[in-house]
Amino acid sequence: MPPKKHTGFMMFVQEWRRNDAEGRKMSMPQAVSKCGELWKKMDAQQRGPYNGAAKEADVVMRCKVERMNCHGQALSAVQREEREAADRQMDMKRKIERMVLNGKAQHDLENTKFIFAAFNYFTKAITNDIYIPAEFAACEFSLKSGKSSLYSSHINPGQLIFGQGSDTLHHTSNTHQLPLPPNALGEANIGKLYVSIVEYLRGCQDGAGQPNEPLVVFTSTELVPVVRGCFRYLESDSDELQENIEVYDIQYLFYVLKKEVMDIADLPNEHINKSITDNLFVNDFFEYHSGISCQFHEDNDRGKYCTQSKVARWCYMFSDYMCGDLAIKPLPGKHMPPKQEPKFRVINPEEPIENRCFSGMTTTEKSSGNTSFASISSLQTEVKHEIVDHSAFSANLNASEDFPSLGGRKGKRNAEPLAKGVWNVPASNCSVKDLGDAFNMPRR
């Protein structure tokens, strides 16, 4: 049953009860009876405001109250944001697929260039999605050329968000360990840095034949909001015309590119799905490789979190899983980490202990009051490492001489087969008298 509509007369009754001292003492039926006489004496002009108020009350009543979630947000607004996010995600996937398919259609997929970018940050604003950047790195990549260029810079934002020093210290100490502002490293002129980054990205994209399109960079799934927030922070401090920088998911690019590469190589790709490629991407084979991060992170053993190392490792992962399908020869420093001389020495366990000392140490010899110094490194000889069995246990488990107890066990009582009709019960040492006494015991 629909709700009853408001009437001008009832609006007049409610107002009269609120304003009249006599009306406040009356019940609703009494007030209706009293106001009925007054309503009859009123003309159309006097009744107009009450009739208008009744129509407005009907409109308000028809408007449903918006449902809220546990955070006090309107459910319709939350659902609208979710739909918009899903649409943006689908649009991003279509654009990534279009980029890869265009290169495949031109038979030039191995020369299609992509820009990989990553940010390290100090902290995130609580009220919005702005991140305070600490380090930036970007590189240009193609399957044939590998990592062709690199841009890397530390960033000094000058100051942190008030009240977030503890969160910033906790985050940085567990990740990149860069010094906090105002002692941060790198460029302090944010506007100049933003212009420099845009020039580099535009130069890479213009070389790919896309001068008028938005700048597109790829980063890992977990870093997509970080890269967007850091670019937004850099834009806010720049007086230049802001560029449209779109941040795409590199892991979806990895999946699409792998399938198309296998299709070009005429290899079956039905078993390739995003879960497999994501697992390959997350299990970073080059994660702890040295010599590919910035000097600060190399000195502090934090190369895993360095942005320069991240973008380089992404290039190496793409090359490692795809160049072989296209018969592209990998080059050190382009498709794989540069070769490095080993900084260790293999020691033969059979070598005397005096020859295992550090090469920098010296020995002192005294002869007839004269002291001479001789470097131990001159006494060391080049040793070829041989595999030596260091097992502490070398006995034969089946040899009775090594384990005398193997042959000392007692034989089984019924080793021989029993005769037919003989019970397989062990012999009892009890006499007949003992058995009889057992049956005659009093029972409780």
UniProtKB/Swiss-Prot annotation:
Subcellular location: Cytoplasm; Nucleus
GO biological process entries: germ-line stem cell population maintenance; male meiotic nuclear division; negative regulation of DNA-templated transcription; oogenesis; piRNA processing; regulation of miRNA-mediated gene silencing; regulatory ncRNA-mediated gene silencing; spermatogenesis
Main location: cytoplasm
Domain of life (superkingdom): Eukaryota
GO cellular-component term (any): cytoplasm
UniProt entry keywords in alphabetical sequence: Cytoplasm, Developmental protein, Differentiation, DNA-binding, Meiosis, Nucleus, Oogenesis, Repressor, RNA-mediated gene silencing, Transcription, Transcription regulation
DNA-binding region: 2-69
Functional description taken from the UniProt entry: Involved both in the piRNA and miRNA metabolic processes. As a component of the meiotic nuage, plays a central role during oogenesis by repressing transposable elements and preventing their mobilization, which is essential for the germline integrity. Repression of transposable elements is mediated via the piRNA metabolic process, which mediates the repression of transposable elements during meiosis by forming complexes composed of piRNAs and Piwi proteins and governs the repression of transposons.
Protein name per the record: Protein maelstrom
